[in-house]
């Protein structure tokens, strides 16, 4: 068994980004990305899950001027689900907190995926 540590804690993982539908530069990060409490994905659904992302996009006051479609203003940003996805066959490339890179398969046990997505949880896997 392996317990929590930097080599067993997920720091980041791949996400397939949507094309910029306005055809130009995406703009400053505050206008193009959505962050959920400092994270871009959560560990609830395994990699490449068929579950839909549930992300409400936060928009700056200039959204209409910059041609940013689909913006909604939301009060609660803490109940979002943003799944790690890739075009690799069978899984996603992920970086662990020790700097190592691992290929995590789509078949990872959901409990194990959730465990590596947290730090200091005391999980053993």
Spans of features found by a protein language model:
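Hydrophobic alpha-helical interface faces used for helix-helix packing
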Residues: 1-125
């Amino acid at each position: 068994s392996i317990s929590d540590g930097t080599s067993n804690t997920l720091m980041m993982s791949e996400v397939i980004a949507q094309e910029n539908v306005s055809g130009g530069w995406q703009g400053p990060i505050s206008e193009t990305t959505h962050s959920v409490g400092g994270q871009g994905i959560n560990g609830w659904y395994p990699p490449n899950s068929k579950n839909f992302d549930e992300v409400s996009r936060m928009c700056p006051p200039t959204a209409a001027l910059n041609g940013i479609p689909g913006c909604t203003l939301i009060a609660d940003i803490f109940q979002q689900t943003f799944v790690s996805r890739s075009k690799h066959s069978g899984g996603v490339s992920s970086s662990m907190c020790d700097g190592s890179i691992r290929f995590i398969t789509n078949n990872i046990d959901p409990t194990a995926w959730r465990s590596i997505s947290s730090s200091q949880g005391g999980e053993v896997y």
